[in-house]
Swiss-Prot record:
Its main location: nucleus. The keyword Zinc applies. Keywords: Cytoplasm, Metal-binding, mRNA processing, mRNA splicing, Nucleus, Repeat, RNA-binding, Zinc, Zinc-finger. This is Muscleblind-like protein 2.
Amino acid sequence: MALNVAPVRDTKWLTLEVCRQYQRGTCSRSDEECKFAHPPKSCQVENGRVIACFDSLKGRCSRENCKYLHPPTHLKTQLEINGRNNLIQQKTAAAMLAQQMQFMFPGTPLHPVPTFPVGPTIGTNAAISFAPYLAPVTPGVGLVPTEVLPTTPVIVPGSPPVTVPGSTATQKLLRTDKLEVCREFQRGNCARGETDCRFAHPADSTMIDTNDNTVTVCMDYIKGRCMREKCKYFHPPAHLQAKIKAAQHQANQAAVAAQAAAAAATVMTQSTAKALKRPLEATVDLAFPPGALHPLPKRQALEKSNGASTVFNPSVLHYQQALTSAQLQQHTAFIPTVPMMHSATSATVSAATTPATSVPFAATATANQIILK
């Protein structure tokens, strides 16, 4: 079985971090000296990063105002190294995926995967660098299409147990104590003032979180009790304070609503479970279809003092006969029945106490036993 996976164009290895000092207009290094990118205004900057022009690396970009960065020589060398490592990583992942697909079909021979020299930008996956056979492939950007990769872990000989994460990552919880920094302010060309812009204008760049370009708000300052001389948190103006308070109020209301919904769901579940429960007084009637058994009539008052009518009560016999007939309908086994008298007299009771020798067939049974011996 042959599996051909086409390489996917990945822009991650073309991404460069933008110099924050250059964005503020205070970088003393030139474009050829700074280790970060100095993009012109025509380039598209997202989250403090810029994508380099692939055609510029090949020397064939003919755009007048290219929205991608044309890197200088030292950054171009770094991007070329990243590109070679990314190509090796793509080939390795494609070969491993092909062999894992072959392993899923029995009878297909398992060939070792050739190893490649791994650069520092590929990652820290030890299975790629030394494993002579397969290792679990984790879906990643720029390796192979995510719809081709299996969504469940594939068990392969010689590979450590690894759980493949899902395609949808968990979303980060909204933080009410953070504000996004104005990018125009970082570039030094924000036309709005600090009291008019909806984004933060921090005076100190050290309080900016470089991961998401946000600042943490000083909650003590909002409550009017910050006594620090040099606070490391951002002190927002009045309009941003109102925005933070509104966000906190909305988050509290959402939490209360979620708790109320959870409590209502719990009560509903308990009431439904109680309604579905069977009563504890289980009777014999549950084992038979409706109408199979007649209700047991009330017992008649005793007329005789010897208690014979209590033993041979016709109503009790009627109920027992109905119960026996219902059992015969459900089971195919033959159950012999003994005829019972509907009433009993004193003579009958006295006859029951007669010794076994008075019975006609008793002597015959004894004689048969003697012959068998």
